[in-house]
């Protein structure tokens, strides 16, 4: 009986190995349930790998790599913008400024009053004072009119300012102009106005001349509850910080624009921030009150705004120094701590290769964006259109059959009709083919926003840069060589990079916002001419320069190929023409007749320093533990998960904090550290392996616990049987 009882407990045992430990809840685990094809589809997609876009080398290949999971949760990746003054932007003030009238000193008001009373008369000011004291009567218009025709603009402005300062919204004022007939005798006395009157058609009688404008300031009481709703903030542009979670920057901006009755291009920011992250960045809009902006932001989940300010100019793409990153890498092996410390120190000392990351080249290995760029540069518009519309396994589910149908029958109108909304460039291209004819590929391409079209040739530029950087590091290592390019003057370095990176920020935005209005950035001839000023301000290093010790490897820039660029005077310079020739191009051919596709060239740092890198190790117990507090959580005093003692912790994470300049990719920083592919496919596979390992470990723990329980039960049963036998023997003896 005891043995049966023991077996029953073992069979019904529900130890840890039977529980779901995937992200803490069973409902979160992906289930097959006969629908395996849908869940397995992402695994079958052909995604770009780093080696396919020239990312092959490391600054220190000997440094130990290690496994860490990036962006396991979006709370593991935090980005704070660094503004043009070098300040890290943090959301820490939720107060909303009210209508602010610029204060004027009392003595200045007295001076204005004395000056104006001489012209207007003290009785006018008394009338205004009486108006302010009078009760509101909606039946009549309560006003005082002041003839200010003889006052200049500055004096009229002073009148308005005095009314604002003295009556604080109880009275409003406005300037009214009206045409009045001017007596001929007055014209004769005002010969200086003769030229202004000549050439105007007049219908006045002989005793009159063309009318002049009479100016009147009307001072009036506002309607009850209205007050002064005119713009009275310190400057035209309202700035504010946007803290978002797991959202696309351009989507946040578009929603704000819709709520504020603005075009998307009228909500400005300095650059795109990561989607799967918690990010803080600066926005600006023109003449929208902080209250209205706050109301608009409340309509979006996972968006918080604050830190309002006022500026005279709008934000533009590239108006920043860089970004501050706080990142958690999960599933770090505790026994690898010493090796990880070595890898971190190496990265801090040597920096990393400033590759363009995978997001630069699209999400399809079968049709990377640079292939479209090559077709455009070679004037093969038919091929470019076909590549953009070509079926691919990385498509969203509804778009794939539309592509396949078009590929078979080339009915652009029918295909376009199946794509709803204006988000997809495929729809714009198909609409263009339907409108201009199935063979007018050049005109059809122009239906795609210009900034989006620029993405394609720029992706090819980026591919060349990556390949050149890899070959330069592989063949010459981490040393300066004669002919390497540096900026002529150090203070021009930042300006040149900022100019080039402004174009890059635009491209990054258009990857996520292809259908927005054109933004206020240099384009076409203007952009090429403006950038060329900087591109010629480099020079090759000499042997004497290198011997002087004045320059470091992080000073070296590599060109992005173009028709107006200085190439290195060493062996690297020839590599550009070799790589262009591989696809039938040359630098001269990059001066395209279509300015949208023309590539003048730019410069980009080859190595990025990581001197401000900080790190720490963090213990945690569950995959759901929040390890880094966001701006919002700090502001609201929302605690992160408590950290257990290392001996008691189930897992260890590596917390990183570092800054990067604009246009540098954090994924390339992490690649140098981890020595592993940072593609989404690789990260997904790593996380699956980590979770499988975790499940196996828990199963092993469960098996051990079960075995221990069985041993204990058997021992208990044996003890009970022995006790029963002894009792029975004693009874028999009696």
From Swiss-Prot:
Residues 725-734 have a biased composition (Low complexity). GO terms for biological process: pseudouridine synthesis; tRNA pseudouridine synthesis. Keywords: Isomerase, tRNA processing. The keyword Nucleotide-binding does not apply. Coiled coil: none annotated. It is an enzyme of class 5 (isomerase). Residues 1-45, 178-213, 491-523, 684-734 are annotated as: Disordered. Its EC number is 5.4.99.-. It holds the Pfam family TruD. It catalyses: a uridine in tRNA = a pseudouridine in tRNA; a uridine in mRNA = a pseudouridine in mRNA. The gene is Pus7. It comes from Drosophila melanogaster. This is Pseudouridylate synthase 7 homolog. Residues 13-23 have a biased composition (Polar residues). It comes from the Eukaryota. Pseudouridylate synthase that catalyzes pseudouridylation of RNAs, such as tRNAs and mRNAs. Residues 1-12 have a biased composition (Basic residues). InterPro entries: PsdUridine_synth_cat_dom_sf, PsdUridine_synth_TruD, PsdUridine_synth_TruD_insert, TruD_catalytic.
